[in-house]
């Protein structure tokens, strides 16, 4: 006779491939029901962006079908993103579970392009995602998300004024670009910069978010210090190109996060090679090759992926439609989506270990 205990017993050896722990022990198997020869249950993953979802479901189905009398297995898949561990000297941001910095050692490496597309790719999996544009002196994210003319609404609350984030392509966002004229330069010293970043963290109605992606300014200055010293960080991602000078600066940025006690989730090599639109089967190493992989090995951090340079990637940023939306089957979009899923998996693993 089929019983719930019997189902859980055969599922107990099935492990989360990344956590290397039993799904049953992790409470990822819930709501087991038996109706004749049909066994159904809910599989609760640690992230909607789980890259190994199909493999886990397949392992569960195979395990349950070993029981005598089982004719059909129905698996409902949901996700509960774990909350990043809190720190006594850091202030959490409302209902935001995980804060992830996308950073670079120097400008011009496509950091904002990566941040925007990773945020949208995570939202496409069903996650609740926000994007904080912390590049105060050069806020480009509004343009890349098609929000150049948007305005932030201000609401009054018992805690003071609260900004309402702008929404597009499935994500919430705030940016200095919403608060100034397009041609207006931001000429601020450190204390003012720190103040606006803290306002974007604590005085924005973010609501419940699985991930808050922070598009950092280049370098290792006040903005990085403010973020890492204010909130518990789920991790940081370093964006570079294969070029030697870019890699040198990326190393400095990476070590800065490590010195601040922030987990570096990995390196993204952007502009890895160029794919000409008239010869899509060809690729040209405009900025060299192998730099990201070499830095990954030398610094002992993962290489999350390599993003090629395509015309569609640039056009998507200019038109305000990220390439993961406009051309999801392109090489760049596939690379960025895979990177987003890797980031989500590493963040969940760090929160549960």
Swiss-Prot record:
Keyword Translocase among UniProt keywords: no
Annotated positions binding ATP: 105-112
Keywords: ATP-binding, Hydrolase, Iron, Iron-sulfur, Metal-binding, Nucleotide-binding
GO biological process: iron-sulfur cluster assembly
Family matches, as Gene3D superfamilies: Fe-S cluster assembly (FSCA), P-loop containing nucleotide triphosphate hydrolases
Any one GO MF annotation of this record: 4 iron, 4 sulfur cluster binding
Assembly mode: Homodimer.
Its job: Binds and transfers iron-sulfur (Fe-S) clusters to target apoproteins. Can hydrolyze ATP.
Family the entry assigns: In the N-terminal section; belongs to the MIP18 family. In the C-terminal section; belongs to the Mrp/NBP35 ATP-binding proteins family.
HAMAP family found in the cross-reference section: Mrp_NBP35 (MF_02040)
Protein name: Iron-sulfur cluster carrier protein
Source organism of the structure: Synechocystis sp. (strain ATCC 27184 / PCC 6803 / Kazusa)
The organism's taxonomic lineage, starting at the top: Bacteria, Bacillati, Cyanobacteriota, Cyanophyceae, Synechococcales
Gene, per the UniProt record: mrp
């Amino acid at each position: 006779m089929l019983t719930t205990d019997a189902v859980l017993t055969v599922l107990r050896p099935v492990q989360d491939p990344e956590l290397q722990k039993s799904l049953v022990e992790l409470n990822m198997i819930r709501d087991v029901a038996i109706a004749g020869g049909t066994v159904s249950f809910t599989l609760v993953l640690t992230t909607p962006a789980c890259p190994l979802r199909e493999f886990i479901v397949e392992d569960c189905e195979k395990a349950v079908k070993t029981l005598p009398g089982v004719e059909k297995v129905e698996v409902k898949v949901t996700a509960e993103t774990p909350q990043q561990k809190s720190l006594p000297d850091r202030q959490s941001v409302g209902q935001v579970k995980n804060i992830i910095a996308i950073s670079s050692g120097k400008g011009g490496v496509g950091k904002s392009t990566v941040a925007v597309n990773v945020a949208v790719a995570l939202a496409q999996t069903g996650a609740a995602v926000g994007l904080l544009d912390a590049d105060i002196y050069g806020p480009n994210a509004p343009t890349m998300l098609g929000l150049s003319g948007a305005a932030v609404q201000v609401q009054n609350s018992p805690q003071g004024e609260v900004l309402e984030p702008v929404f597009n392509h499935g994500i919430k966002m705030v940016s200095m670009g919403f608060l100034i004229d397009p041609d207006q330069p931001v000429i601020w010293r450190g204390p003012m910069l720190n103040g606006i970043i803290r306002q974007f963290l604590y005085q924005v109605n973010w609501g419940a978010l699985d991930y808050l992606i922070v598009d950092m300014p280049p370098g290792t200055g006040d903005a990085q210090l403010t973020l890492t010293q204010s909130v518990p960080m789920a991790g940081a991602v370093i964006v570079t190109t294969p070029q030697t000078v870019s890699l040198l600066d990326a190393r400095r940025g990476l070590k800065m996060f490590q010195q601040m006690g922030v987990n570096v989730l990995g390196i993204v090599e952007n502009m890895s090679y160029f794919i000409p639109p008239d010869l899509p089967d060809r690729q040209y190493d405009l900025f060299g090759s192998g730099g990201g992989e070499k830095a990954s090995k030398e610094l002992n951090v993962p290489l999350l992926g390599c993003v090629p340079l395509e015309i569609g990637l640039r056009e998507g940023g200019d038109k305000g439609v990220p390439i993961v939306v406009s051309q999801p089957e392109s090489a760049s979009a596939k690379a960025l989506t895979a990177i987003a899923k890797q980031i989500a998996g590493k963040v969940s693993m760090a929160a549960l270990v």
